[in-house]
Amino acid sequence: MGKIINIDPEILSGTPVFSGTRVPIKNLFDYLETGETIDEFLDDFQGVQREQVIKLLEFSHKMINSSAGILHENFA
């Protein structure tokens, strides 16, 4: 599988979307935030492949973990 995120000014004014679709990446996180499942997301956005979702979540996980040294936590 190639790239999973596409940013093109001609597609939704440059909003990051799943490659090969017009489905914004944000939609996946909105679904997950409201307690919906990956399967529900995929049912509603049939152009997105499960592999794309998994790779995006793995990428996000790696980015958060690798950013631990530069993020500032304020527990005040």
Question: Which stretches of residues belong to each language-model region?
Answer:
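Small, basic N-terminal interaction modules of short regulatory proteins
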Residues: 1-76
